[in-house]
Amino acid sequence: MDDILSQDEVDALLKGMGGGDVETEGDDTSGGQSAKVYDFTNQERIVRGRLPALDIINERFARGFQRHFNEMIMASVEVTAGEVKIIKMIDYLRNLFVPTSLNIYRINPLNGVSLFTLDSKLIFTAVDIYFGGTGLLPFKIEGREYTPVEMSMVRSILDISSENMRKAWGPVMDIEIEYMHSEMNPKFAGIVDPTDMIVVSPINVRFEGVEGRVDIVMPYAMLEPVRD
């Protein structure tokens, strides 16, 4: 028996499908699982892969920061760029100690604001070495404010950070760093909504026997120019 339909049979079948007289595979929704609805505006679904251009920027920043930081504290310090992390703002803030030097900046012409985070270990060690110490004295990160001397060190570190950030971005685009304000308590330093995704670029600063860190924190949406 010939399994090929005649043209009249094909026409009748198409007419039945269009009018609903003939069931199609897509008509049967019983017994199957319902379709999942995806929110394509959810950043967690669209954040994928690495940011190779940002890795290069961070390497440039680390080299420049090392040179200037060595000159500033008159000691040998090794500075390296760590692995970039993409996480929620709330997850980043909840893991910070108090006090932490949290400094909010604009990076013009990029949209939004960014965060330069200096951990207290970096600040305390740099101050000790600057005044002739070894940087190896034990210290406790307490819930206290920074001293005037420690704040002066923070400002000096921020100055060289801003300059080297501008130079590191130079081959990609011209930027200007605009300081806005500083905080010590993480709950006052959210630069985006708590559940928004941020990009954390850790810069590791190794003294002899001690390690501190600078984090450059930017909203994921800010980095459109360097995603490709």
Specify the residue positions occupied by each region the protein language model found.
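N-terminal auxiliary interaction/assembly segments of multi-subunit proteins
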Residues: 1-228
